[in-house]
Amino acid sequence: MAKKVVTDLDLKDKKVLVRVDFNVPMKDGKITNDNRIVAALPTIEYILEQNGKAILFSHLGKVKTEEDKEGKSLRPVAARLSELLGKEVKFVPTTRGPELEKAIDELKDGEVLLFENTRFEDIDGKKESKNDPELGKYWASLGDVFVNDAFGTAHRAHASNVGIASNLESAAGFLMEKEIKFIGGVVDNPARPLVAILGGAKVSDKIGVIENLLTKADKVLVGGGMTFTFMAAQGQEIGKSLLEADKVELAKGLLEKAGNKLVLPVDAVVSKEFSNDAPFHTVSADSIPADEMGLDIGQATIDLFTKELQGAKTVVWNGPMGVFELSNFAKGTIGVCEAIANLTDATTIIGGGDSAAAAMDLGFADKFTHISTGGGASLEYLEGKELPGVASISDK
């Protein structure tokens, strides 16, 4: 990649600012999933090995008012990171000012500091989220070099990524480098055949991705709630299934443009209610009863998609095939996940979000080449958009 990576920087004796993505799920002040903290370890450990001083910061949730601060402190993250690194992580409960500056000045080579949630700066005028130039400049003044390892926020121009990078030599961390390599590789130079599998509820969320991938992929397999808008565009009866009526014409246009590249489900698991307790059965895609709704793909579609995947050299998957959180309608997602996991000769990528959670829940995570840490960021990358957080990293 043409961007600087952390290994391109001289880190010895340097104050290294690191934008990490520690936006982890919390419940009652406890971290319920530490994947994002674990994902940042290689970059942090490399900086420490090089005798740099690691100054870490991240956002956590949305913070608009003083009340929102409740439960949004990064203090529990500092404690967990300390356990994972096996060394002390100094936590500074502020985002600017003398306390933070003093703590940074006192840091020794090979030590780690984490300061408070960057979004606490959003309470007074959204300074973080609107990339306030003064804030970006101030944070940049706290370090000698900047490493951006937060792919999850790369699609946003914030003070803590773009703002700092505008004022300081910057590089991608190892996680960011990996994301650019795999997600960027799908868009720029995939090994072929490239098969994309897109699911999720709404066409509107995935229009850009479908449009872009139809120009790049050899096949695009569509599942999830958005299939019914495509079926309606073909004149099929979809009963009470989810429909975005204002997107039917658009779906029609995509179908015409796609030809046989776009593959839709041939059957559906239907029920009268959006519930795990109601009776359900499988029907062919063109005969969904008027009083029922499609909530998953059926076995014939799982078999069809499995067949379409055979021989693929690159597979990218984003979005569940049905209402994955209800066990009666999770079989499609499980089947597709398994089919991708069983491909031995392909680069297999999950574009974050619900699909990543599904693969982890099912114990298939280690069977995939890459699982993205950024749902929104990977989607925008797959749309072919330039990501501000990536673009702002110094060129080699």
From Swiss-Prot:
Keyword ATP-binding: yes
Chain positions recorded as substrate binding sites: 21-23, 36, 59-62, 119, 156
MF (Gene Ontology): ADP binding; ATP binding; phosphoglycerate kinase activity
Keyword rRNA processing part of the UniProt annotation: no
Enzyme Commission designation: 2.7.2.3
Chief subcellular location: cytoplasm
SUPFAM superfamilies, sorted: Phosphoglycerate kinase
Top EC group: transferase
GO terms for biological process, alphabetical: gluconeogenesis; glycolytic process
Swiss-Prot/TrEMBL catalytic activity: (2R)-3-phosphoglycerate + ATP = (2R)-3-phospho-glyceroyl phosphate + ADP
Keywords: ATP-binding, Cytoplasm, Glycolysis, Kinase, Nucleotide-binding, Transferase
Localization, UniProt: Cytoplasm
Binding site for ATP: 206, 294, 325, 352-355
Pfam family, any one: PGK
Sequence similarity: Belongs to the phosphoglycerate kinase family.
Name the UniProt record assigns to this protein: Phosphoglycerate kinase
Organism: Listeria monocytogenes serotype 4b (strain CLIP80459)
